[in-house]
Amino acid sequence: MSSFSESALEKKLSELSNSQQSVQTLSLWLIHHRKHAGPIVSVWHRELRKAKSNRKLTFLYLANDVIQNSKRKGPEFTREFESVLVDAFSHVAREADEGCKKPLERLLNIWQERSVYGGEFIQQLKLSMEDSKSPPPKAAEEKKSLKRTFQQIQEEEDDDYPGSYSPQDPSAGPLLTEELIKALQDLENAASGDATVRQKIASLPQEVQDVSLLEKITDKEAAERLSKTVDEACLLLAEYNGRLAAELEDRRQLARMLVEYTQNQKEVLSEKEKKLEEYKQKLARVTQVRKELKSHIQSLPDLSLLPNVTGGLAPLPSAGDLFSTD
């Protein structure tokens, strides 16, 4: 069970995804560290404002899970979140995608029905959402552009394997190779290979897995000990399930990378085969020229075999001899 630190929380928030498993896993971890409720909410609020628009709603889902599931253990989170929720709702309503308004309203209705917060505070949150919905035209246009970009990205990510492949610049090959190697190396420390955690899970007492054994508990002290053990088991299993889910996504991503890498290498191979054929033809032409040149050289007369036509003749007169008066 990892200890609390702001840097650890920042890392976990950066890895938070919009899945129930991811939200519940982090929620359990936060509730376990509820004595740090103040710093937790402060980091949550800061990271919410820094998060990409498509992830902001997930931060509020996390806050909801923490607030509702921590109430029986104490009011720490309910109180701490209350101090930042007005700004958080206003910020998310203003900065997140247009489709987030209905989920936010549904969340507030649930809080009102379950009396998570008082009616006056709920109304304040609703008003903060309404007041934030009038961005300047330029900002609205930029947000729309961002939204389209995110949708395009989502459409690409929804396919486990690309149905079509667009040729890549061969110069991207080394970068893709490095990414593939890193992805393979990261999987060496995957959750499925964590023997230590698997041993901890295997060593959990039978009481945390078998409801029928609860009848054997006869005193409050034993019940409290078991409650603590069950809480720790829930956190251990939730964290491990979260890691396994992340590993599964990593392996899917690796499979996509392998498909892309294979396609890239096929294109590079095809290009190199064309180059090889081109240079084979050049070699053949140069070899033919060499052969013809050798044959031509062999057909030329050997000047060293010609007779010495100047032998026995007087040397030609010099310029001085020609103009001499003697």
From Swiss-Prot:
Phosphoserine PTM sites in chain numbering: S132, S134, S166, S299
Domain of life from the UniProt record: Eukaryota
Modified residues (Phosphotyrosine): Y161
Keywords carried by this UniProt record: Acetylation, Nucleus, Phosphoprotein, Transcription, Transcription regulation
Subcellular localization, as worded in the UniProt entry: Nucleus
Tissue-specific expression: Widely expressed in the adult with highest levels in liver, colon, prostate and uterus and lowest levels in heart and kidney. Not detected in rectum.
GO cellular component, one term: nucleoplasm
CDD domains the record matches: CID_RPRD1B
Residue ranges of coiled coil: none
BP terms from Gene Ontology: positive regulation of cell population proliferation; positive regulation of transcription by RNA polymerase II; regulation of cell cycle process; RNA polymerase II promoter clearance
Modified residues (N-acetylserine): S2
Chain intervals for the UniProt region annotation (Disordered): 128-148
Ranges where the CID domain occurs: 2-133
InterPro entries to which the protein is assigned, alphabetical: CID_dom, ENTH_VHS, RPRD1A/B_C, RPRD1B_CID
Recorded GO MF terms: identical protein binding; RNA polymerase II C-terminal domain binding; RNA polymerase II complex binding
Ranges annotated as biased composition (Basic and acidic residues): 128-144
Role of this protein: Interacts with phosphorylated C-terminal heptapeptide repeat domain (CTD) of the largest RNA polymerase II subunit POLR2A, and participates in dephosphorylation of the CTD by RPAP2. Transcriptional regulator which enhances expression of CCND1. Promotes binding of RNA polymerase II to the CCDN1 promoter and to the termination region before the poly-A site but decreases its binding after the poly-A site. Prevents RNA polymerase II from reading through the 3' end termination site and may allow it to be recruited back to the promoter through promotion of the formation of a chromatin loop.
Subunit note: Homodimer. May form a heterodimer with RPRD1A. Associates with RPAP2. Associates with the RNA polymerase II complex.
Protein name according to UniProt: Regulation of nuclear pre-mRNA domain-containing protein 1B
